[in-house]
């Protein structure tokens, strides 16, 4: 492999979108609390109303692209957004502000005041601020398939046969593939299967994908912060098979990490997320 090849890191998935929506929902909560304290002027009230309308619309649209288990209401996102702010600002929610007595503490019976406090918020799901793991997570009984000296058709068939006989849940798929008997690449795929009533299993999410060269160096990395949902089983295999197409096109020179990344990202329409390559000539 060429020495000037650089590691290409790609981040794909709605993680940043979720974080942004949740943070803006936290801002909306702060606006509303300021309004309850009768401390928001007319322009501020107008911004509050516009932000609320924008968030309601954006959440409705975003939830359509999320699996049902991950869809959240505006109120749920407010709770997470407030916790994000507390993490970002190291804010102590029990600390008071000298010289300031909140209006709602003096007039708690007012109908505009909320009947909850900071400590009523549910815990933030998962890790704070969508932490991104650097390596595929360890999973019990990982799936491992080794492919050597197979043509694309046989390799694809073996993948399809093997992955559809595995148990439902998270898996890790390890593939070794020779390219012209010169270069072997190791591909780690972390994803999830769904089990249907008829016993058929389909690939529903792709958590992450790493590609290593024969020396163990990472040459391409796809991180799904909130997982990549694939529409159906055929779509899932199409994504995996595209890797073999990228790795087996008969290039006369070593395959570039950037080319591989573009090939994978194009399956999701996410080419714009490719990080700039430096020194990969």
Swiss-Prot record:
It comes from Influenza B virus (strain B/Singapore/222/1979). Gene3D superfamilies: S15/NS1, RNA-binding. It holds the Pfam family Flu_B_NS1. This is Non-structural protein 1. It is found in: Host cytoplasm; Host nucleus. GO terms for cellular component: host cell cytoplasm; host cell nucleus. Residues 1-103 are annotated as: G1P2-binding. The keyword RNA-binding applies.
């Amino acid at each position: 492999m060429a020495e000037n090849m650089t590691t290409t890191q790609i981040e794909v998935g709605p993680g940043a979108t979720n974080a942004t929506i949740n943070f803006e929902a936290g801002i909306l909560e702060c606006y509303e609390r300021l309004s309850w304290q009768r401390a928001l002027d007319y322009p501020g009230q107008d911004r509050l109303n516009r932000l609320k309308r924008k968030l309601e619309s954006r959440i409705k649209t975003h939830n359509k692209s999320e699996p049902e288990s991950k869809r959240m209401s505006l109120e749920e996102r407010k709770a997470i957004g407030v916790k994000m702010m507390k993490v970002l600002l190291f804010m102590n929610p029990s600390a008071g502000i000298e010289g300031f007595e909140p209006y709602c503490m003096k007039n708690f019976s007012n109908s505009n005041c909320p009947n909850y406090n900071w400590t009523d918020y549910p815990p933030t799901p998962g890790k704070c601020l969508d932490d991104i793991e650097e390596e595929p997570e360890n999973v019990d009984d990982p799936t491992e398939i080794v492919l050597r000296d197979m043509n694309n058709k046989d390799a694809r068939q073996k993948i399809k046969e093997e992955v559809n006989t595995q148990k439902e849940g998270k898996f890790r798929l390890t593939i070794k593939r020779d390219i012209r008997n010169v270069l072997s690449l190791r591909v780690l795929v972390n994803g999830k299967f769904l089990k249907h009533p008829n016993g058929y299993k389909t690939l529903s999410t792709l958590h992450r994908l790493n590609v290593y060269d024969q020396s163990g160096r990472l040459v391409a990395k796809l991180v799904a912060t909130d997982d990549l949902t694939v529409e159906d089983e055929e779509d899932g295999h199409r994504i995996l098979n595209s890797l073999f197409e990228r790795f087996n096109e008969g290039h006369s020179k070593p395959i570039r990490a950037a080319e591989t990344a573009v090939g994978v990202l194009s399956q999701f329409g996410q080419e714009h997320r490719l990080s700039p390559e430096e020194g990969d000539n």
